[in-house]
Amino acid sequence: MDSPSNSIQNLQQEAQGSSSAQLADHDHDRVSMAMPLQTDQSVSVSQSSDNLRRSRRVPKPRTSIYDEYEEELKERANKPKRKRPAPPKKKAPSTQNSKSNDKVEKKKTTSIAKDGKPTLKTNDKKVAPKPKPAHEQVEPALIPSNWTSVIPLLTSDFKNQYSVISRLKNPNMKPVPYAGDIIKLMAFINKFSSFFHSDLQNLSFQDFEVGLDLYPGDPNGSAAGIVKGPEDTSLLLYPDFMAIKDIVYCQDKMNLLFLSLLDLTFTENFDGKSAKKKGPLTTWENLKSSSKKVFSNPLYRLRLVAREWGYPREWRQQLPSDQDISKPKTALFEQDEQTPVVDPSHPEILTPNIYTWNANEPLPLESNPLYNREMDKNGILALKPMDRVVLLRALTDWCASHSSAIHDEIYKLTHGKKDPVFGIQTQQVPRYTIEGVDNTINQFKKLCSLIQSRYEIRSKKKHFVKQLKEGKKPDLSRKLEILKEIKAELKNAVKSEKDELLFSLYDKWVPLFEGELPDQPLANPFSERLYKLRLQEFFLGRVPHIGDFYMPRLHSYGDSLEMSTFTDLRNLQALLSKFKNNEYNAFTLFENDGQSMSAQFKLFYHDTPSLAHDVARGRNTSGKVYWYELCHDSATLLEFLEFLDYKIVKPQDEKKEGNEKEKEALNNEAHILEQKSTTDNNPSINTNPLPKDAKYNTARKKLQILKEFLSDYYFILRQFEQMKVQFADMKPGKRQLRRIQRQTVNYNTEYDSEEYVDDEEDDEADIYDDNDNDSSFDDGRVKRQRT
């Protein structure tokens, strides 16, 4: 225990300490109040030494920013790059019932199980993910140009291809330089058939040759006759193997065609409607009239305008081949005036030289075929054979350019409500002639599956379902019912028979195509006016590295044709199969207006690659032959089909192994020896196959398609030839003749012979009357008289 004296001393010290502390606090307050005055007056205070702040009056020394941050920049450069953080997950969209922002949602705590996988606690609730909105199925797109019944025929297909004529060398192959002109005439008659007489609508290529006295050339060049055979090279003229009346009939047809073209060129106020009502403008009566001005009047008008319209190339003065047409022919002055011009801005004060340039002027009047005065009496037969073809071709061009009736018809064909989906192309051909029958049918099947999926997807869409329930889509409802019937029939069919059944349900598929596509692969290309003007009706096929094939036959367009080969693929196949199975014959053709079509045919090969390259390079094509005859009747057609077998077969590969290689080598040698023997015996045929290069594989396929098509075509062509022989002078119709009608038989042997003879004569007279009524020569050409 402290003593009282010590405690008193301690109390006194505490009191002094507290008083000194109060004085210190009081002094501190005074210092703090006086500090600002002191800092304002002193300017030498340093913050680094005294840890005091710098005076505002002291300027801050200028330092480089790079110096200040140099070390920091070095540290950042040496520091390794951080990995890019993963993008944050998107938050679920907030809803109206979500909690307010001031309430923070508690995070779900997870506990780690023994296996290391996080598990939710028992009090946590599982949140089911929201279902994604279902996307509507999109209807498959349909490109109209891929599903048309007609395909454009482009010359650019042969841009990098070259043909070799000798590959198709066979005994029946003949150069025909006039084939292109006659095919052009036949195409003009075919497209504007309403302006021509019915006897001109079934002309065959042979009718033109006989009527114009033209002969196809032999393999060595043009000839003035037809070669009798490979062994006998003597030439035959048409009177040597044809009846004179048939030759005269063909010549009369050519004069009728010539007069029809003349009248059609200069006629006015005549169109297709008046031709259907009143008939053709020119008939046999006009040709056989006693007037001497049948040809003279239209020929007089033609001679006046021919120079303005333009003469054909063959009737113009030909320029010498060694003459440069870019240089003038003659000059009025020997040298041009070279006096310097005083005023260069007016050089016309000098006398210019007058030049005469080369021009393809028409032939002189004495050698111009158009001014042949014999044409006023004999028509086109007054000219030479090749001049006849040239004049008919020129008349076709003049008629198409200046005839008002043809202009009106062309305007109707080119100004329809719709245009071709593939654009305006110069030439168009049916799809099955390019792609073949099987590929065209497969295209139709693909289209059916696409159309079915489009309707099925459409029927499930909400707005369509609503409209169907309200009855606002009757057309769609009807199509869905048709589709339902088709699916029911296909469902019950066997898998192997589905393709045939799908093909047989064509009539039910057609309404489903309406409104979806303007055309479809199996439609009839000859019934659509949209394609009529540019359609190549005589086209048969195109083979790469070889060329095109044509079979000119009339006529393609007509409402009365019941057995026409110019129809859609379905009807054509059905017709060809019936002739192939002998269900139809020549008499069936005769009953169903078979004589309104060409009874004869010729198959031609067109060297399109050579023509395309010659035209592109600016070469002169006159005098060159691009058309070749391959067959002219059903017998030579069979020979051509056998010839195609040599070209379709692919050469065997030389790489063989072991004994098979030796055996096949021996077989190949034997086969080569056989080929050499055949070619040696018959050098006019080339039996070598196409080259083994892979680029010729497409050519082999196309030749196979052409062979199959011609093989089916053979049977109907043979019946047409038989019909021409059996029913040459008879008018077609379904009325049976008296001689083939079934008559009652008299079994009584006791009859008066004189009575029988009288009855027989009466029957013959009746038959004669019928033949007079049915004869095709009762229209001003030849008339029979009863005796």
Curated annotation (Swiss-Prot):
Which InterPro entries does the record associate with it? WHIM1_dom
Reported function: Functions as a component of the ISW1A complex, which acts in remodeling the chromatin by catalyzing an ATP-dependent alteration in the structure of nucleosomal DNA. The ISW1A complex represses gene expression at initiation through specific positioning of a promoter proximal dinucleosome.
Q: Which gene encodes it?
A: IOC3
Q: Which GO terms describe its biological process?
A: chromatin remodeling; regulation of DNA-templated transcription; sister chromatid cohesion
Task: Add the further remark from the entry.
Answer: Present with 1770 molecules/cell in log phase SD medium.
Query: How does this protein assemble?
Result: Component of the ISW1A complex, which at least consists of ISW1 and IOC3.
* Spans traversing the lipid bilayer: none
Where is it mostly found?
A: nucleus
Q: Where in the cell is it found?
A: Nucleus
Q: Which Pfam families match?
A: WHIM1 (PF15612)
- Region annotation (Disordered) ranges: 1-137, 672-693, 749-787
Q: Where is the composition biased (Low complexity)?
A: 40-50
All disulfide bonds of the chain are none
Superkingdom field:
Eukaryota
* Organism of this sequence: Saccharomyces cerevisiae (strain ATCC 204508 / S288c)
| UniProt name for this protein | ISWI one complex protein 3
Locate the compositionally biased regions of type Basic residues. Answer: 79-92
Classification of source organism: Eukaryota, Fungi, Dikarya, Ascomycota, Saccharomycotina
